[in-house]
Protein backbone atom coordinates (compact mmCIF):
# COMPACT_ATOMS: atom_id res chain seq x y z
CA UNK A 1 0.00 0.00 0.00
CA UNK A 2 1.19 3.53 -0.78
CA UNK A 3 2.24 5.87 2.06
CA UNK A 4 -1.09 7.66 2.06
CA UNK A 5 -3.43 4.77 2.76
CA UNK A 6 -5.13 3.80 -0.48
CA UNK A 7 -4.26 6.98 -2.39
CA UNK A 8 -1.22 8.00 -4.39
CA UNK A 9 -0.37 11.69 -4.00
CA UNK A 10 2.20 13.02 -6.47
CA UNK A 11 1.92 16.66 -5.50
UniProtKB/Swiss-Prot annotation:
GO terms, biological process: cell division; G protein-coupled receptor internalization; neuropeptide signaling pathway; positive regulation of cell cycle process; positive regulation of membrane protein ectodomain proteolysis; positive regulation of neural precursor cell proliferation; protein localization to cell surface; receptor internalization
Superkingdom: Eukaryota
Cellular component annotations (GO), alphabetically ordered: cytoplasm
Residues with the Pyrrolidone carboxylic acid modification: 1
Keywords noted in UniProt: Cell cycle, Cell division, Growth factor, Mitosis, Pyrrolidone carboxylic acid
Example of a GO MF term: receptor ligand activity
Function: Stimulates the proliferation of neural cells.
Subunit structure: May interact with SORL1 (via N-terminal ectodomain); this interaction is impaired in the presence of SORL1 propeptide.
The protein's name in its UniProt record: Morphogenetic neuropeptide
Source organism (scientific name): Homo sapiens
Amino acid sequence: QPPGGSKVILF
